[in-house]
């Protein structure tokens, strides 16, 4: 129960910090989604590590999914069922209403197909990095030192220099 309260506190803090991103109109939500998609597309093209705010967006989505997971484990529910079966406070003040709206908008962003596609791409990038590390470990274990040195260094070997002594003349 304490962990659940901590998650809800984190979500409300996130709601306050991202208030400028979330608004009531559909045009602003679509503009936000378009901005997210363009940033995701550029990070996909560059194949670089994702910026920190995108990783925190992934963490926020997993946090939102963890908050909803006890209700969803009972069975498959649709969005309408989840809204109807949640325990709502008796008195809805402005703060709780705005927090619920922000959480709902974050859920819509996390459940959008484009975001899920981007999340799969990020997992593929992380898997490729892990595969490269595993291949390097295999090379280190199976290949002897000389062959490994020749693989990683492209320098030609220096010929042996024989000392000339009086007996060579």
UniProtKB/Swiss-Prot annotation:
One of its GO terms (molecular function) is neuropeptide receptor binding. InterPro entries: NeurotensiN. The keyword Zinc does not apply. It comes from the Eukaryota. Keywords: Cleavage on pair of basic residues, Cytoplasmic vesicle, Secreted, Signal, Vasoactive. It is found in: Secreted; Cytoplasmic vesicle, Secretory vesicle. GO terms for biological process: blood vessel diameter maintenance; negative regulation of gene expression; neuropeptide signaling pathway; positive regulation of gene expression; positive regulation of phosphatidylinositol 3-kinase/protein kinase B signal transduction. Residues 1-22 form the signal peptide. The record marks 159-161 as: Cleavage. GO terms for cellular component: extracellular region; transport vesicle. Pfam families: Pro-NT_NN. PANTHER family: NEUROTENSIN/NEUROMEDIN N, NEUROTENSIN_NEUROMEDIN N. Interacts with NTSR1. Interacts with SORT1. Interacts with SORL1. Belongs to the neurotensin family. Neurotensin may play an endocrine or paracrine role in the regulation of fat metabolism. It causes contraction of smooth muscle. This is Neurotensin/neuromedin N. The lineage of its organism: Eukaryota, Metazoa, Chordata, Craniata, Vertebrata.
């Amino acid at each position: 129960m304490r962990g659940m309260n901590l998650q809800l506190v984190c979500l409300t803090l996130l709601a306050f910090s991202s208030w400028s991103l979330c608004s009531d109109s559909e045009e602003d939500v679509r503009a936000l989604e378009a901005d997210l998609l363009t940033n995701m597309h550029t990070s996909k093209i560059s194949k670089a590590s994702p910026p920190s705010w995108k990783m925190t967006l992934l963490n926020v989505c997993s946090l939102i999914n963890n908050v909803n997971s006890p209700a969803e484990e009972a069975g498959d529910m649709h969005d309408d069922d989840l809204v109807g079966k949640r325990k709502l406070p008796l008195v809805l003040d402005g703060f709780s209403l705005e927090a619920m709206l922000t959480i709902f908008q974050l859920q819509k962003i996390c459940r959008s197909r484009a975001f899920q596609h981007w999340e799969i791409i990020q997992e593929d990038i992380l898997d490729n990095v892990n595969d490269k590390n595993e291949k390097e470990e295999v090379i280190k274990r199976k290949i002897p030192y000389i062959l490994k040195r020749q693989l990683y260094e492209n320098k030609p070997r220096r010929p042996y220099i024989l000392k000339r002594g009086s007996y060579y003349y």
